[in-house]
Every structure is written in structure tokens, then in C-alpha cells.
């Protein structure tokens, strides 16, 4: 029994691009095995945050370190999901470094 005119939108965020690629592949494989149509994964723009920190505690304004955090994002749409698809996605165990947001529309 298919849920009519519905789709599941899954947004993934991670700092490590390898983890997010593995997780998206697991989600796509699981959805395709249950007979749902998958659109994606769509890579969204990478958010880069840069921080500059003074190394010395008192003087030496020129002594600084720069750090960067990159947040990778992916978007997956599952069109016409079945009940098996929803059950399989709920049972799926993903990596701990991946943030998953699921919305129905």
C-alpha cells in the first residue's frame, strides 16, 4: 500500500564527507530495495566556518592560528514511499557523526 502524493525528504549533515557519503548510500539502497523511487542524493553547499585564535597569552599579536570547520550537507527525496520503506528507514542504523532530519510532505 503506497502513501498517495507523499514524499519523504531527508537532510543529512556531517563534518566528514566520507561518513555522509556512506550514510546516503545506505539510505538510497534501503529505499530502492523496498520499491520506492529515490531522487538524489543532492549535494548542498558546504558551510565553511573559519576561526582565528591568538597563540600567545599576553603579547605577540602576529602569532595566530587559523582553524576551519566544514559542514557537508546532502538532500534525499523519496517519492511514493511504501510502508516497508518507512519501516526499513526507521530500523536503519547510521554513523554517529551524521545528523539526520526527516520530514514528510
Swiss-Prot record:
GO BP annotation list: translation
Keywords: Ribonucleoprotein, Ribosomal protein
InterPro entries registered for this protein in UniProt: Ribosomal_uS10, Ribosomal_uS10_dom, Ribosomal_uS10_dom_sf
Cellular component, GO, one term: ribonucleoprotein complex
GO MF term set: structural constituent of ribosome; tRNA binding
Keyword Transferase: no
Pfam families cross-referenced by the UniProt entry: Ribosomal_S10
SMART domains per UniProt: Ribosomal_S10
Domain of life (superkingdom): Bacteria
Quaternary structure and partners: Part of the 30S ribosomal subunit.
PANTHER family in UniProt: 30S RIBOSOMAL PROTEIN S10 FAMILY MEMBER (PTHR11700)
Family to which this protein belongs: Belongs to the universal ribosomal protein uS10 family.
Job description of the protein: Involved in the binding of tRNA to the ribosomes.
Name of the protein this chain belongs to: Small ribosomal subunit protein uS10
Organism per entry: Francisella tularensis subsp. holarctica (strain LVS)
Gene expressing this chain: rpsJ
Amino acid at each position: 500500500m503506497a502513501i498517495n502524493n507523499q514524499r519523504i525528504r531527508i537532510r543529512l549533515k556531517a563534518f566528514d564527507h566520507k561518513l555522509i557519503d556512506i550514510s546516503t548510500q545506505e539510505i538510497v539502497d534501503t529505499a530502492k530495495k523496498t520499491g520506492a523511487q529515490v531522487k538524489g542524493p543532492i549535494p548542498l553547499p558546504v558551510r565553511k566556518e573559519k576561526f582565528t585564535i591568538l597563540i600567545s597569552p599576553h603579547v605577540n599579536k602576529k602569532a595566530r592560528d587559523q582553524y576551519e570547520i566544514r559542514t557537508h550537507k546532502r538532500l534525499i527525496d523519496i517519492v511514493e514511499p511504501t510502508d516497508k520503506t518507512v519501516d526499513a528507514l526507521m530500523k536503519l542504523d547510521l554513523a554517529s557523526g551524521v545528523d539526520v532530519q526527516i520530514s514528510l510532505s
